Amino acid sequence: MKALQLFFVFILCSTARALNATASCTIDRYEHVDSVVSQCKSITVESFAVPAGQTLKLHLQAGTTLTFNGNIAFAYKEWDGPLMWIKGNGITVQGTNSHLINGRGELWWDGHGGHNNKKKPQLMMIQASGNSVFKNIKVKNCPLTCIGISDSHGITLQQWTIDNKDGDTKGGINTDGFDIARSDKVTIKDSTVINQDDCICVNQGQHLLFTNLHCIGGHGLSIAAGLYSTYEMNTVYNVTFTNSILENSRNAIHIKTIPDANKKGEITSITYDNIKLIGISFYAINVQEDYTNDGSTGHPLGNIPVKDLKINNIYGTMSGPYAVKVYILCGSGGCSNWKWSNINVSGAARSNSCNFTPNGFSC
């Protein structure tokens, strides 16, 4: 009998240890983050609030699987952020159907975005490698840029929903969906972005694929180069946008370079293919080499040439009094070897404007 009692005690103690081990790998308070991340490789994140001015740092061990299962919200402070920072090699980050990452952007929005003295934080920074996967993630109301991807190599983001539609009426500005820099072999697919700025914006990177996206509102599928001082950091190479829908956006396709003779770089081997447009209000295709945050200068430079630009099967509708199907403004020597085909867009209210003519398209 005594031996039997000891056996049951052992079983109960073992079960308790197992339960404690499981519980210790669940984050349900901000104070638990560091200990769980350092000890566990299978992590569940439940609901809690991140204190004002703090970054939720999920710097994961290699091979970790992290699952968002609750609602994460962030307290208000005027600062640069990011509010969340996910980092790791060979990691899987996923969400259940019940989770939400709520940036509470309505607390910061003022109709000025990043163009005044009121600081607004980026919602999330991702730095990952080793075939890491981020899937089924739901994000709401980013104060400024939603997702920044930097220093990442060989990662996939899929089945994301970024819902910033509240910003349409509450002053959301510069709420880019995904910004990419210093990265290669990044894929973003099967995702929806509702926002007030670029759906995708590539600042620097190579071997990037964006497919099966639905971008609503915002400013389109963009490449923006010239932000940095070095040639390498102003170079974008081998980027493909395909099989996507742009709906009620300002632009559909937008390539923009900053005219600064001291900043060199290049944009090469870019493909836009099979893009559907619905109600685009300004430009179906806009390539400009005179872009600044304060607006277009009207004086393009070829300091960052756009080469080997392939655009095919762009179709759909535009609406409104400012709609232009194609706008091209190249600096001297700034555009070469463009091949366009099957540009079938209706509803433009204004004529095309081009100072460079692509092969296969007549302005």
Indicate where each model-derived feature is located.
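Fungal secretory targeting signals
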Residues: 1-20
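Extracellular beta-rich repeat passengers
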Residues: 46, 249-363
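Short glycine/acidic-rich loop motifs that flank beta-strands on beta-rich extracellular proteins
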Residues: 52-55, 76-81, 104-107, 122, ...
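Right-handed parallel beta-helix
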Residues: 63, 68-70, 89-99, 130-141, ...
